[in-house]
Amino acid sequence: MAAWFWKGKGEGEDRPKKVNIAEGLWVKCDSCKEIVYRAEVDRAGRVCPKCRYPFRIGARERIAAIVDEGSFEEREAGLSSRDPLGFKDTKRYTDRVKAARSKTGLEEAVLTGLARIGGHPLVFAVFEFGFLGGSMASVVGEKLARAIELAIQKRLPLLIVSASGGARMQEGILSLMQMAKTAAALKRLADERLPYISLLTDPTTGGVTASFAMLGDLILAEPRALIGFAGPRVIAETIRQPLPEGFQRSEFLLEHGQLDLVVERREVRETLRRIIGFFAGRSLPAP
């Protein structure tokens, strides 16, 4: 009769050995669902070696991947969120902000400053999705507005790398106001005929998509990034119809004329260098 269960005869006799695998050695790809070796993902710039899906990365990693080494000079680092509405849901808003600061090491969901790409100077802003979903609070809007004014003052191109769930609900109408505030600041930049490049990463949604993220002179995106206003599940439940294949992904938007270019992560830096170099070669107009 076949044995359905294995039973060791004694301690140490032909017993299968337990293999200890270090925690964090492997990671699951959100796109192809493959379990891949983390070191391979890191070597590829946080990109899945199986399907080329770009994993989400933080603001500091993004800076290291895009701008010239050591060239980023942060501005407005002292600005931080308050609690204008005394907001509380399951937690106090102030406690959520403290936890986000501890988790990311940042004061807010966006870093802004001066940088260089390929030796070309520019004003650079980059979102940290790990900070309350990269949500746009009043301080985020203020930092972006000041970055835009800095670009005008110094006659420099502007690059914003977005990764956000939209406006921060804990600040209510004050967060929604940042949509108009950033759009108005970008109108001044456009009036000065200074270039604005918008790079959309996964995810870029809500009030961020409905304002500055889609106002670039050139709008680039990483592959398979989720880009939209409401999420696909909400839309499908509202219209009660199935959504098209790839709906709200960067390739779908490119196909429908809402993006200029979808760029593999390993090519982002060189693509931006060429774009900014083109504008630099044109000599940006004086005021």
Where in this protein do the model-derived segments appear?
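N-terminal alpha-helical interaction blocks
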Residues: 1-17
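An N-cap/entry alpha-helix motif that binds or orients negatively charged groups
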Residues: 12-16, 27-28, 55-112
